């Protein structure tokens, strides 16, 4: 997927305070900045979910939101489930944005600048959204599956995955109970 992407410009805004981004990914290349999902309005107003050059997962939004894991995602043979939940209405700062990898919340963070209470992010706004790149570059080099973007609800990772009783591994929930609202979507991709 090193030069392919999907793009959509929304005509109106969805809920920008409560959201969920959930997807499964397999990386083909590490050590280079790769954007999985982005929202772009201008060079000053944008957001993205990025795998940095150091292979850490990062959620960035132009209005001083920057949350990056300490964990590095370097295994090109593994599928990773990523779930990012946003609820800026929460009183506790760390509850406003959570990152889960394979069903486990990442609490050891390299950077943790959370959204202000009741802030709105660029994802879900009436601007360009892209899966697989940001503003014409930083292409994601890998495979994606079961990609959900949901506005209006901050679902937990357990809505999209479950622990296999036989193997003990985190696996895809192929029939999640999810409500898709304005500007929400689901792509199977596999």
Feature annotation, model-predicted:
Residues 45-47, 64-69, 104-110:
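Surface-exposed loop/edge segments in extracytoplasmic proteins
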Residues 65-66, 120-144:
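Extracellular glycan-interaction patches encoded by glycine-rich segments
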Residues 1-5, 91-93, 98, 104-113, ...:
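Extended recognition patches within non-cytosolic domains
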Residues 38-40, 47-52, 58-62, 85, ...:
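Beta-strand-rich, repetitive solenoid scaffolds
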Residues 2-58, 90-93, 153-158:
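Extracellular glycan-recognition modules
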Residues 1-19, 65-74, 133-136, 171-178:
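Short surface loop/edge beta-strand patches of beta-sandwich-type extracellular domains
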Residues 21-29, 82-84, 131, 144-149, ...:
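Short hydrophobic/aromatic patches on beta-strands that form ligand-binding or substrate-lining surfaces
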Residues 23, 77-88, 99:
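Short tryptophan-centered beta-strand motifs in secreted/extracellular beta-sheet-rich domains
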């Amino acid at each position: 997927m090193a030069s392919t992407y999907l793009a959509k410009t929304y005509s109106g805004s969805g809920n920008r305070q409560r959201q969920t981004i959930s997807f499964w990914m397999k990386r083909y290349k590490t050590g280079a900045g790769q954007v999985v999902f982005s929202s772009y309005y201008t060079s000053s107003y944008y957001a993205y979910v990025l795998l940095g050059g150091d292979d850490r997962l990062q959620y960035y939004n132009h209005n001083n939101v920057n949350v990056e894991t300490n964990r590095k995602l370097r295994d090109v043979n593994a599928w990773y489930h990523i779930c990012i939940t946003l609820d800026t209405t929460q009183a506790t700062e760390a509850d406003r944005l959570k990152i889960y990898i394979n069903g486990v919340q990442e609490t050891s963070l390299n950077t943790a600048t959370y959204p202000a209470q009741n802030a709105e992010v660029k994802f879900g706004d009436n601007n360009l959204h892209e899966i697989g790149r940001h503003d014409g570059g930083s292409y994601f080099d890998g495979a994606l599956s079961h990609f959900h973007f949901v506005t209006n609800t901050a679902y937990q990772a357990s809505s999209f995955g479950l622990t296999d009783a036989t193997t003990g591994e985190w696996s895809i929930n192929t029939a999640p109970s999810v409500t898709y609202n304005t500007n929400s979507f689901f792509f199977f991709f596999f």
